[in-house]
């Protein structure tokens, strides 16, 4: 199944407890394979990126695609 990057930008990202973390604002691709490696998520208002298990700053976190459990109407994480 194929999915376009434009379909992912702006989607809500939820953790394993179905709590909203924020929205996808950018995507990182592997140039060789064309596969998504990382999603960049702009966090909801008061979430502190330093309290999350991913690298982040300035209200954004970089989440490896390996931490994504599924893509649907929301992006579901396995953490």
Q: Where in the sequence are the language-model features?
A:
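Peripheral interaction segments used for macromolecular assembly
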Residues: 1-79
């Amino acid at each position: 199944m194929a999915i376009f990057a434009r379909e992912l930008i702006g989607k809500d990202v939820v953790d394993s407890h179905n709590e909203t973390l924020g929205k996808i604002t950018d995507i990182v691709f592997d140039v060789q394979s064309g596969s998504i490696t990382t999603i960049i998520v702009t966090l909801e208002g008061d979430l502190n990126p330093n309290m999350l298990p991913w690298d982040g700053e300035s209200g954004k976190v970089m989440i490896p695609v390996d931490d994504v459990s599924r893509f649907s109407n929301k992006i579901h994480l396995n953490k």
